[in-house]
Amino acid sequence: MIYKVLYQKDQIVNPRRETTKTLFLEADNVVAARTMVEDNTPYNIELIQELTGNSLAYEKQSPDFKLTTFDSKDN
């Protein structure tokens, strides 16, 4: 499944709508998506939304749509 993650780049500063960023990632469920972002970034997650159907098709039309991947931390 594809998830849209809205976040702030910093966990210290209070969230502001004007500074909210977005990333897209593929994960098995919303918990796995949150874990991936929390384990690999310092971001303050505001919202994680599953994208399906028309919502996914709409987001894919954006030139900013790109799936984010994280390197595995397995040794």
UniProtKB/Swiss-Prot annotation:
The keyword Transcription applies. It catalyses: RNA(n) + a ribonucleoside 5'-triphosphate = RNA(n+1) + diphosphate. GO terms for biological process: DNA-templated transcription. Belongs to the RNA polymerase subunit epsilon family. NCBIfam families: PRK13667.1. A non-essential component of RNA polymerase (RNAP). RNAP is composed of a core of 2 alpha, a beta and a beta' subunit. The core is associated with a delta subunit, and at least one of epsilon or omega. When a sigma factor is associated with the core the holoenzyme is formed, which can initiate transcription. This is DNA-directed RNA polymerase subunit epsilon. It comes from Lactobacillus johnsonii (strain CNCM I-12250 / La1 / NCC 533). The gene is rpoY.
